[in-house]
């Protein structure tokens, strides 16, 4: 492939929608490789809980941006943006067609739309103080110092509220004034995967996750990095950790993980609807529809 501006294919969809399987079929057809845009699959030793592409799948098609760092060394959005864009540019220079696949809207848009995110590391002491104040008080503080960000952040969203306050207190500038958009010079086709039976797919994946060994994987992560590893607070690992601590029976852990995953999928779909404008694929024949749309885009 040789064209200017370079062509890039993006496949987005909620968790458990089948992105990995479809992406591999697309990559096989177009003889290309996959860039994995996922906020957890970038970490080593976290395979089951993140539904990472299997060893066989990775042998079949080369996947970039998987297993690039130890879980003890968190990668923020800005760092991931830089790593991913370099990897994608390398593919472009080799006249390959980059295929970006993921469900993390923030990470994907940072790459494809070029959002600049302030490079402010977590301020643990500040976060503890803000958490003690409570979410309602924190949101009121944010409304006073950064009203633009406050309008965009849900009153109940503690993580984003504290992050916006953190950036303000460290830099002295509102987060909203520091978000700059410098999109890469790519021509992008954004395809969307929206399954009708997503709840059933999530239920099957959740059960399979526990049958496949997420509890043992969590135990190994705790053994290597300690129980305070932040990423162990994410969906699936939090519940597995509670099982290990005898705070939760396995059946309740599966039930809770399923509920949280459905809630997460709902937020993903809302994000894609509000912040992206994908061409939604026909669920009756996903691969055929994707091929038709990509070939038309490349002509």
From Swiss-Prot:
One GO molecular-function entry: tRNA dimethylallyltransferase activity
Start and end residues of each stretch annotated as Interaction with substrate tRNA: 38-41
InterPro entries per UniProt: Dimethylallyltransferase, IPT, P-loop_NTPase
EC number, UniProt record: 2.5.1.75
Keywords of the record: ATP-binding, Magnesium, Nucleotide-binding, Transferase, tRNA processing
Stated family: Belongs to the IPP transferase family.
Record protein name field: tRNA dimethylallyltransferase
Taxonomic lineage from the root: Bacteria, Bacillati, Cyanobacteriota, Cyanophyceae, Synechococcales
Name of encoding gene: miaA
């Amino acid at each position: 492939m040789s064209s200017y501006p370079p062509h890039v294919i993006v496949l987005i969809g909620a968790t458990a929608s089948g992105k990995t399987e479809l992406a591999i079929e697309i990559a096989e057809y177009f003889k290309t490789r996959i860039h994995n845009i996922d906020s957890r699959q970038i970490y080593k030793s976290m395979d089951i809980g993140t539904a990472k592409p299997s060893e066989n799948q990775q042998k079949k098609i080369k996947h970039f941006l998987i297993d690039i760092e130890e879980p003890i060394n968190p990668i923020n959005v800005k760092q991931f943006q830089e790593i991913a864009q370099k990897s994608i540019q390398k593919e472009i220079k080799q006249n390959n067609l980059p295929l970006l696949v993921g469900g993390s809207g923030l990470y994907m848009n940072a790459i494809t739309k070029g959002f600049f995110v302030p490079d402010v590391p977590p301020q643990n002491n500040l976060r503890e103080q803000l958490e003690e104040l409570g979410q309602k008080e924190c949101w009121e503080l944010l409304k006073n110092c950064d009203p633009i960000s406050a309008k965009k952040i849900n009153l109940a969203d503690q993580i984003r509220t504290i992050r916006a306050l953190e950036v303000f207190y460290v830099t002295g500038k509102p987060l909203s004034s520091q978000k700059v958009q410098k999109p890469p010079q790519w021509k992008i086709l954004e395809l969307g995967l929206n399954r009708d039976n997503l709840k059933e797919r999530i239920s099957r994946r959740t059960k399979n996750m526990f049958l496949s060994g997420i509890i043992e994987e969590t135990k190994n992560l705790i053994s290597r990095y300690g129980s305070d590893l932040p990423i162990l607070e994410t969906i699936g690992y939090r519940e597995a950790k509670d099982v290990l601590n005898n705070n939760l029976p396995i059946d309740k852990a599966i039930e809770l993980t399923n509920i949280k995953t459905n809630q997460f999928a709902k937020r993903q779909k809302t994000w894609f609807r509000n912040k992206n404008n994908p061409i939604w694929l026909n669920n009756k024949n996903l691969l055929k529809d994707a091929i038709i749309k990509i070939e038309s885009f490349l002509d």
